[in-house]
Amino acid sequence: MADNPTLGEWLVRRGASRRAVLAYAAHVGALMALPPAARSALAQGLASTRRQSVIWLSFQECTGCTESLTRSFSPTLENLIFDFISLDYHETLQAASGEAAEDARRAAMAANKGKYVVVVDGSVSTKDGGVYSTIAGIANVDMLRDAAKDALAVVAVGTCAAFGGLPAAKPNPTGAVAVSELVVDKPVVNIPGCPPIAEAVAGTLAYLVAFGALPELDSLRRPKAFFGETIHDRCYRRPFYERGLFAEGFDDEGARRGYCLYKVGCKGPVTYNSCATLKWNGGVSFPIQSGHGCLGCSEPDFWDQGGFYRPLSTSMPGIGPTLAGAAVAGAALGGAAAWLSRRHLKSFQAGADKPEGDAS
């Protein structure tokens, strides 16, 4: 085989069958809502392309995005970095350190000029020349510009990289900004979340590997496959919202019955993400299923929107009177339905208490 094997050849060397490649492509295609023909093209692309060189840069971040990626179930982290991409630089996962690590980064960029993908997690410090966050004596802002210059594309993983995140919270002492504010001449895709869902990261990278292009994006540069609907759209508690049945606190009867968490601050109606469908840890659960409202962590400025437990209102950006009115109307209808139900029950009980044969 060639010294620079295709991904298909590489997988054969590792004992993977064509069936396994097709199964993985079908899974990723389903996650991204691709039509059957595109899933076949995805499988062909994965088999015929070469392993994608990835330079992963970590700036002002908490390593939560990497933590999330380690919990990817399809593909697993080891499948992703050994079979599908060549992770040539990642501070947390690489064996090398110090100058050896920086040499590896520069060598990978030179060997794959114009073909490597830069993944960034963490916001970028720009104040005072970016001195508040440096790696090997290099300011994050300078390292990003140098890496992005010859990249195929840039993927901003996590809300910090996508929108500035918590480091950009007022008063933003480090001048933290999103990757897209600095990289203006390369394709940029945002995969927000604090942290993002692992399969959204892995699926986007797999699409890049197979097609050499970004998936369809929304106005905030997020893949529509994962951020095309609000959490509210797919939430299993949505029927309770429609009926006006809400938890008023985290330990009241409504909470115990699994009612809608809108009144305790859930931001699901204005948050675009696939938490309610993909869920976390291999589809085990997501925050609302675990009893806590959505914080809106995949939306810009969620960190400066006031209390997490304050109900959405018309005074908040992104929500108008229609949605707030719907909640009020839902509550009114739900209350009316409950009143009618109680009235019907009382009438039934009164009838049951009458002596047999009493028609009065």
Give residue spans per PLM region.
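N-terminal secretory signal peptides
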Residues: M1-S17, A359
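A conserved mid-domain beta-alpha-beta active-site/ligand-binding segment of alpha/beta enzyme cores
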Residues: A210-K279
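N-terminal twin-arginine translocation
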Residues: W10-A20, A30-S48
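Cytoplasmic C-terminal tails of single-pass
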Residues: F348-S360
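Juxtamembrane/start-of-transmembrane alpha-helix segments at the extracytoplasmic/lumenal side
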Residues: T314-A326
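Catalytic-core regions built around general acid/base machinery
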Residues: I138-A151
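Metallocofactor- and cofactor-centric catalytic cores in central/energy metabolism, strongly enriched
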Residues: R51-S53, Q60, G64, D83-M109, ...
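Alpha-helical transmembrane segments
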Residues: A329-R343
